């Protein structure tokens, strides 16, 4: 039968969601299941064939002989979780007897890490114990009743430790009253459950034990203050009264070794998973007073009576005990443990035993003080000692390991175990004692307690008997001996290691394991897999003992069986029948083997597969990235190489004979021009002519074939001139006067419109064969001022082209050639004019079309080269310098002579027909670029727009006036200069706005020149 229905309903109402897992299918209460938890806290949990194994938390029942020893490593977070779970279970009425409690706490402990201990060697002979198994059981039964009676009056304190909410406590009280107590179920066990839940989370401030003793000794017990981190309970509860007694009981270790097969918790502590708490000898040996009438064996009766007296004083003086802290209670417990060790030696050995322990008999000669009136009578001392031993033995078996181990783990200032110095000396002085049963079976804790019991037995009696028990207890708090204080820390550690090595048990039994691909593996799946292996080997499933699931693996031990199957046989059979086992179990077996459980470390297969998958994915991504970079680099290289290859082919095709000297010289010139950077310093006004294209753009990036870029160059300083400051200011005043005086500007423009050039005949331009070559009949070349082509080289065998040379100061060498934008029929004539006049700079001041009206024919190739009659034009580069203009470079080749020339075109984009640019600054910047390219050349500059008069005339006027000022002219007459231009080509500067723009541009440039001059 499971728990009653009202209890389950109350549990569902009280428990919050997901705090405790659902209870499994229950069995009748009181049924002793294997592996039950809580045997350290409550008796009656383990069966007759089971022993309580100390797992460092609650204790676990295991079948005898117990083979699986481990300790849980409990973190502060895990302790808090266990405390909450215990509070809720205790508050709802569950005890350790309930299967639901077992299930919940087993689930809570399943995720805690374990440290596996080395079990005692099975072959090592066990010496017979001083107490038989029957006497041990008798002590256990009698001690349980005595301890229950002794501690039942302290139940208010234990209940006060449970800090559960009022609702939980009320529910627990009603539930406990409603149901009858089961066998082995008492309030003491439940109270201890609550007590452990609270005290396991205690923490103490860090500090050395030496500092604690120094602070403790000068004070009396009545002056002690409660620890700050101790649990807070009601002031009316005698908390420290019970705590002192429990701590004294908890520190006790049984004096005699257990019999064979005994696996009580105090004996399992021989192979600790961590260093035990330090127990140091008192600083000064003292003796305890003996009761009257017992001079024969003071160790057997006097110490026991004194311990009993101390316990009674703890009852009578709760006010003094209430000030004790956790660390001080631990000290009292250790002291009483040593006294109890001495009592046991006196009972077991008598005076000879005391002599064997190295005593000189000085205790018998010391004074014997009497106890106060509340001491026990002489004839009842031995019985009281028996009862006292039963109480201590009972409490040691239930609470000793838990309280002391938890306290040790939670003390941050705890020191490693220090081996007493006189132990090695006593062993060497008494070699026969090394073969005794006590040393053969003694653990680390027993060696420690026995050693210090000798020092406690040799203490001097205190001056005050009976009533001064608390003063004696305070003065006898354990302290470091002089030998230990003088010993270096390294030597202490070395001695401690040596002592532990002497008592370490043998390696634990090898275990078989099977690693699967499922992480975590469920316990039922692991058991089913082991059962499949058992059926495969035709052995009973009971041959596989201690089946446990660790992550993705199931571990087991093979016990003795009729078929003599060993763990190695199981491993071999698993490997040979891997496919069959995988088919029956539905699991994939990754690994099998045999090894020590403490050394088994399984790599989760999923993590391994995930790591492998991640590694493969990262490798593929890296390879893809590298491949992408290589492909991109190769593509860029191929594109650039292809472009260069096409350019070389075009350049090589300019010559008819690849082997000719002219072609080789031309190719070498091209390579030099593409590789040479311009000089850093500006060229002088009279330097030699340079034919390198790169030198034309010394203030900008080097052009590359078919490259397009943009840059602004307005920050460039104006060209240096020879104009002095006075002349500049005079010219600037003249310009400003013209611009401000609108009437004067109007009169000058009217005079210019009425001006007629002499001579002004245009008969050649008006011939019938030449009329189609004119874009506008309003702008025809004068007969005396026109460019003559070589008729023998012309495709039309004519010397006419609508272009006029513009002379400046030298009538033999024109500075400009003003011409119209080429027509489709005159493109060859245009390139012939460029070639024959030796021009290297073309200034284009019009877009190709305006509002759908063609302004100029596209007379250059967009890419590659075009052939115009005998002239091949190859586009080398095109640079967009700003929004207003761009620059193109051409290679011009005469196919008749195989000669080549570099021609640069400056194309201004934002100047429309019969209009002006939006800003004079952009045109002045454009002019600087043109002059920088042209500087040092003697050939004319070809300037054209649509008709070759309005915009071309304005540009030529501005450039001519500024060049004169740069050469140091003292007087400037812009109107006269314009009349000079119109004498050579009609219609130059077509509108008044264009004339006014010319004045503004000149004034702005003069102002810039004046700013650049040194003041």
From Swiss-Prot:
pH dependence of this protein's activity: Optimum pH is 4.5.
Topological category with respect to the lipid bilayer: Single-pass type I membrane protein
Keywords: Acetylation, Cytoplasmic vesicle, Diabetes mellitus, Glycoprotein, Hydrolase, Lipid metabolism, Membrane, Phospholipid metabolism, Phosphoprotein, Protein phosphatase, Receptor, Signal, Synapse, Transmembrane, Transmembrane helix
PANTHER family attached to this UniProt entry: IA-2 PROTEIN TYROSINE PHOSPHATASE, ISOFORM C (PTHR46106), RECEPTOR-TYPE TYROSINE-PROTEIN PHOSPHATASE N2 (PTHR46106:SF5)
GO MF, one annotated term: transmembrane receptor protein tyrosine phosphatase activity
Glycosylation site list: 564
Family indicated by similarity: Belongs to the protein-tyrosine phosphatase family. Receptor class 8 subfamily.
Lineage: Eukaryota, Metazoa, Chordata, Craniata, Vertebrata
Name of the protein in its database record: Receptor-type tyrosine-protein phosphatase N2
CDD domains: R-PTP-N2
Domain notes: The cytoplasmic domain appears to contain the autoantigenic epitopes. The leucine-based sorting signal is proposed to function in trafficking at the plasma membrane.
Major enzyme class: hydrolase
Marked site: Cleavage: 427-428
PROSITE patterns from the UniProt entry: TYR_PHOSPHATASE_1, TYR_PHOSPHATASE_2, TYR_PHOSPHATASE_PTP
Species of origin: Homo sapiens
Biological role: Plays a role in vesicle-mediated secretory processes. Required for normal accumulation of secretory vesicles in hippocampus, pituitary and pancreatic islets. Required for the accumulation of normal levels of insulin-containing vesicles and preventing their degradation. Plays a role in insulin secretion in response to glucose stimuli. Required for normal accumulation of the neurotransmitters norepinephrine, dopamine and serotonin in the brain.
Motif (Tyrosine-based internalization motif) on chain: 666-675
InterPro entries xref list: IA-2/IA-2_beta (IPR033522), Prot-tyrosine_phosphatase-like (IPR029021), PTP_cat (IPR000242), Receptor_IA-2_dom (IPR021613), Receptor_IA-2_ectodomain_sf (IPR038112), RESP18_dom (IPR029403), Tyr_Pase_AS (IPR016130), Tyr_Pase_cat (IPR003595)
Cellular compartments annotated: Cytoplasmic vesicle, Secretory vesicle membrane; Cytoplasmic vesicle, Secretory vesicle, Synaptic vesicle membrane
Subunit: Self-associates. Interacts (via cytoplasmic domain) with PTPRN (via cytoplasmic domain). Interacts (precursor form) with CPE. Interacts with HAP1. Interacts with AP2A1 or AP2A2 and AP1G1; indicative for an association with adaptor protein complex 2 (AP-2) and adaptor protein complex 1 (AP-1). Interacts with AP2M1; indicative for an association with adaptor protein complex 2 (AP-2). Interacts with MYO5A.
Basic and acidic residues bias locations: 421-432
One cellular component term from this protein's GO annotations in UniProt: secretory granule membrane
Side Cytoplasmic, residues: 637-1015
């Amino acid at each position: 039968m499971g728990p009653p229905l009202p209890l389950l309903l109350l549990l569902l109402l009280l428990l919050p969601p997901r705090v405790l897992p659902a209870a499994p299918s229950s069995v009748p209460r009181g049924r002793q299941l294997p592996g039950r938890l809580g045997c350290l806290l409550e008796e009656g949990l383990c069966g007759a064939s089971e022993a309580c194994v100390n797992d460092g938390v609650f204790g676990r029942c295991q079948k005898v002989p117990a083979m699986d020893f481990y300790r849980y490593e409990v973190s502060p977070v895990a302790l808090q979780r266990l405390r909450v779970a215990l509070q809720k279970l205790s508050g709802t009425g569950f005890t350790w007897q309930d299967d639901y409690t077992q299930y919940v706490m087993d689930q809570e402990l399943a995720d805690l890490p374990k440290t596996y201990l080395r079990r005692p060697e099975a072959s090592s002979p066990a010496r017979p114990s001083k107490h038989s198994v029957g006497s041990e059981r008798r002590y256990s039964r009698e001690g349980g009743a005595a301890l229950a009676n002794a501690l039942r009056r302290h139940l208010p304190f234990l209940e006060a430790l449970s800090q559960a909410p009022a609702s939980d406590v009320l529910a627990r009280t009603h539930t406990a009253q409603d149901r009858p107590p089961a066998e082995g179920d008492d309030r003491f066990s439940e109270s201890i459950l609550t007590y452990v839940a609270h005290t396991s989370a205690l923490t103490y401030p860090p500090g050395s034990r030496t500092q604690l003793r120094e602070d403790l000794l000068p004070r009396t017990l009545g002056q002690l203050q409660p620890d700050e981190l101790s649990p807070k309970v009601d002031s009316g509860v005698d908390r420290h009264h019970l705590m002192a007694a429990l701590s004294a009981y908890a520190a006790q270790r049984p004096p005699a070794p257990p019999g064979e097969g005994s696996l009580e918790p105090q004996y399992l502590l021989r192979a600790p998973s961590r260093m035990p708490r330090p127990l140091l000898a008192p600083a000064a040996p003292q003796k305890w007073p003996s009761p009257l009438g017992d001079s024969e064996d003071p160790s057997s009766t006097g110490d026991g009576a004194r311990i009993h007296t101390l316990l009674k004083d703890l009852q009578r003086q709760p006010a003094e005990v209430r000030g004790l802290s956790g660390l001080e209670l631990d000290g009292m417990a250790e002291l009483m443990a040593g006294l109890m060790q001495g009592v046991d030696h006196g009972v077991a050995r008598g005076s000879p035993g005391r002599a064997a322990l190295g005593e000189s008999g000085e205790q018998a000669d010391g004074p014997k003080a009497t106890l106060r009136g509340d001491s026990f009578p002489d004839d009842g001392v031995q019985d009281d000692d028996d009862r006292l031993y039963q109480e201590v033995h009972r409490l040691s078996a239930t609470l000793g390991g838990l309280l002391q181990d938890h306290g040790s783990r939670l003390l941050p200032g705890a020191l490693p175990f220090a081996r007493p110095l006189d132990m090695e000396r006593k062993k060497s002085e008494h070699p026969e004692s090394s073969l005794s049963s006590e040393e053969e079976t003694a653990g680390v804790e027993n060696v420690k307690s026995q050693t210090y019991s000798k020092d406690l037995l040799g203490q001097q009696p205190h001056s005050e008997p009976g009533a001064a028990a608390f003063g004696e207890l305070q003065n006898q708090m354990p302290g470091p001996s002089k030998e230990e204080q003088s010993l270096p820390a390294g030597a202490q550690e070395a001695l401690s290691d040596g002592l532990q090595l002497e008592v370490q048990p043998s390696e634990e039994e090898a275990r078989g394991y099977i690693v699967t691909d499922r992480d975590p593996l469920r316990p039922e799946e692991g058991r089913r897999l082991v059962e499949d292996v058992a059926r495969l080997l035709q052995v009973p499933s009971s041959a596989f003992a201690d089946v446990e699931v660790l992550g993705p693996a199931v571990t087991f031990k093979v016990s003795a069986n009729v078929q003599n199957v060993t763990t190695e046989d199981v491993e071999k059979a698993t490997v040979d029948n891997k496919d069959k086992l995988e088919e029956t179990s539905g699991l994939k077996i990754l690994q099998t083997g045999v090894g020590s459980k403490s050394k088994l470390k399984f790599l989760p297969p999923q993590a391994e597969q995930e790591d492998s998958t991640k590694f493969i994915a990262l490798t593929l991504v890296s390879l893809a990235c590298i491949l992408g970079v290589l492909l991109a680099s190769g593509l860029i290289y191929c594109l650039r190489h292809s472009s260069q290859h096409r350019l070389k082919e075009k350049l090589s095709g300019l010559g008819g004979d690849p082997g000719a000297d002219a072609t080789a010289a031309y190719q070498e010139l091209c390579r030099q021009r593409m590789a040479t950077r311009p000089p850093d310093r500006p060229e002088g006004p009279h330097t030699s002519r340079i034919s390198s294209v790169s030198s034309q753009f010394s203030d900008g990036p080097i052009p590359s074939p078919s490259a397009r870029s943009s840059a602004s160059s307005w920050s460039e300083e104006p060209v240096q001139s020879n104009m002095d400051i006075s002349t500049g200011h005079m010219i600037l005043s003249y310009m400003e006067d013209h611009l401000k005086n609108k009437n004067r500007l109007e009169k000058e423009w009217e005079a210019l419109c009425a001006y007629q050039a002499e001579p002004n005949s245009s008969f050649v331009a008006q011939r019938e064969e030449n009329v189609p070559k004119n874009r506008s009949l309003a702008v025809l070349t004068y007969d005396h001022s026109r460019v003559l082509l070589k008729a023998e080289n012309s495709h039309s065998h004519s010397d006419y082209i609508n272009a006029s040379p513009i002379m400046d100061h030298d009538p033999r060498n024109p500075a400009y050639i003003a011409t119209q934008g080429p027509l489709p029929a005159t493109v060859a004539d245009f390139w012939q004019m460029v070639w024959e006049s030796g021009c290297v700079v073309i200034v284009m001041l019009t877009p190709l079309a305006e509002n759908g009206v063609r302004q100029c024919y596209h007379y250059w190739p967009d890419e590659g080269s075009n052939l115009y009659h005998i002239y091949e034009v190859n586009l080398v580069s095109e640079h967009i310098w700003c929004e207003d203009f761009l620059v193109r470079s051409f290679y011009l080749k005469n196919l008749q002579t195989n000669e080549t020339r570099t021609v640069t075109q400056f194309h201004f984009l934002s100047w429309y027909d019969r209009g002006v640019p939006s800003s004079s600054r952009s045109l002045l910047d454009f002019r600087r670029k043109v002059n920088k390219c042209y500087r040092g050349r003697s050939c004319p500059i070809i300037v054209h727009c649509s008709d070759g008069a309005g915009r071309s005339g304005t540009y030529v006027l501005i450039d001519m006036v500024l060049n004169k000022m740069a050469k140091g002219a003292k007087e400037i007459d812009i109107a006269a200069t314009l009349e000079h231009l119109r004498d050579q080509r009609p219609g130059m500067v077509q509108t008044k706005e264009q004339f006014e723009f010319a004045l503004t541009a000149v004034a702005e440039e003069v102002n810039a020149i004046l700013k650049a001059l040194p003041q």
